[in-house]
Amino acid sequence: MHRAVAQFEAESQGDLAETRVKIADPFLETLRLKTAHVAHQDGMEQLADGLTLLLRIIMHRHGPNKPAGGMPHPASYFPLKRLDFESLRHKRFFRSAAAAEWPHSRPVNIGRYLKSRQKTVDRALDGYLPKANVKPATIHKAMRYSLFAGGKRLRPILCLAAAEACGGKIANALPFACAFECIHTYSLVHDDLPSMDNDDFRRGRPTCHKVFGEGIAVLAGDALLTIAFEIVSRAAPTKRYSMATFLRETAVAAGSRRLIAGQVADLEAEGKRVTRAELRYVHENKTAAILSTSVRLGAMSANATTRQLAALTRFGRALGLAFQVIDDILDVTQTSEKLGKSAGKDIAAKKATYPAIIGLEASRVEARRLTKQAHNALTLFGAEADALHALANYLLEREY
């Protein structure tokens, strides 16, 4: 085992063009069990990551004597071809971590789940927004252009998953899910403006102000924010939560003490040296506020108990912070084509980010820590929270 790992490490540094390692069935089984055990021990994450990656490579490199439907024959060999280590670094680090952070939930086909929920949210959004030909057509076209630009719909999907975790119905949570997608999109439209981040691309295509002009983009953002409250007003109150509570939660999350507060702090931090606490304030408000409140309102739509709401609030807050740390990492590790927006813009604008303050590796560790915190917040729930666990892992592993 030591020899195999040593050869793999040497190859990953580019010292060997090709390595052939003879592996027997007992070794594979031992490695699998050891990886599963080590991955749960505090302070051993890096070893678990290495073992997990090695096992994956072995399992996908079938030797010439592999019997049909079985493990490779002991006499088989597995070519470990030279790896582009840097291209695998982000995916390997987070995927192996995600697999270990919460092993107790049942597997969820996250691709199928996201696609299904995205369709549900998009149908509802299409019904809530005025059609593109409704007068004044320009503003409604601009709203729809930005809203239906192919976003991942993570906030509304988390809202729906939170409702299901509390035993609620998707239909009751949909108004909140759609409202917070409108608020999120409004913030992006305004964030891309020349007076803010001055970005030309969003979600893989020209930003709203590049297509419709700056004035219409400002108004489209305003309209998306205000229609969010109209959509919330269509939700049904529950025994524990009134319409006033729904509207107040929405207003606070999008207002000057949360989302706007984060935007202001972000602008004021440009070009300055900020502390980690100051950066956390930006992330808590600019990103985590909307994400965590969408989770809270999903729970409220299901008439969540006080304990359930508190647990999901902790989950949403930790996940929102992890989401932004990953965003910071992706800005310096991915291409514009991959992200669908301008890569490296945070560095160019001298923005405060986790990689800039604590470094890339420490940022990855922080993202994992926050994701684990999100998983731990869900211990109150059983299988009904499997989708939330899967979504947390998905956000940790994402590459754009």
Q: Where in this protein do the model-derived segments appear?
A:
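Intrinsically disordered, low-complexity segments enriched in glycine and mixed charged residues
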Residues: 1-33, 51, 87-91
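Intrinsically disordered, low-complexity regions enriched in polar/acidic and amide residues
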Residues: 6, 12, 40, 44-45, ...
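Polybasic, low-complexity intrinsically disordered segments
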Residues: 28-94
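N-terminal amphipathic/basic leader segments beginning at the initiator methionine
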Residues: 106-128
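Mg2+-dependent prenyl diphosphate-binding active-site environment of isoprenoid biosynthetic enzymes
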Residues: 119-120, 129-379, 383-399
